[in-house]
């Protein structure tokens, strides 16, 4: 599965996708309702 790179802008289609590292934007690691 694709992951979010550090510093990548978090947009709606990235919500809930895994991060490439622990330093990514928090919102990308959280599934919104």
From Swiss-Prot:
Expressed by the venom duct. It comes from the Eukaryota. GO terms for cellular component: extracellular region; host cell presynaptic membrane. It is found in: Secreted. The keyword DNA-binding does not apply. The modification Proline amide is found at residue 33. Changing residue 2 to A: Increase in toxicity in insect larvae. Keywords: Amidation, Calcium channel impairing toxin, Disulfide bond, Ion channel impairing toxin, Knottin, Neurotoxin, Presynaptic neurotoxin, Secreted, Toxin, Voltage-gated calcium channel impairing toxin. Disulfide bonds join 3-20, 10-24, 19-28. One of its GO terms (molecular function) is toxin activity. The presence of a 'disulfide through disulfide knot' structurally defines this protein as a knottin. The cysteine framework is VI/VII (C-C-CC-C-C). Omega-conotoxins act at presynaptic membranes, they bind and block voltage-gated calcium channels (Cav). Has strong insecticidal properties at a dose of only 100 pmol/g of body weight (when injected into the haemocoel of the wax moth G.mellonella larvae). Provoques tremor and uncontrolled movements in insect larvae, that are typical symptoms caused by neurotoxins. On fish G.niger, intraperitoneal injection of the toxin causes full extension of the fins, change in posture, breathing difficulties (at 30 and 100 pmol/g body weight) and death (at 100 pmol/g body weight). This is Omega-conotoxin-like Vn2. It comes from Conus ventricosus.
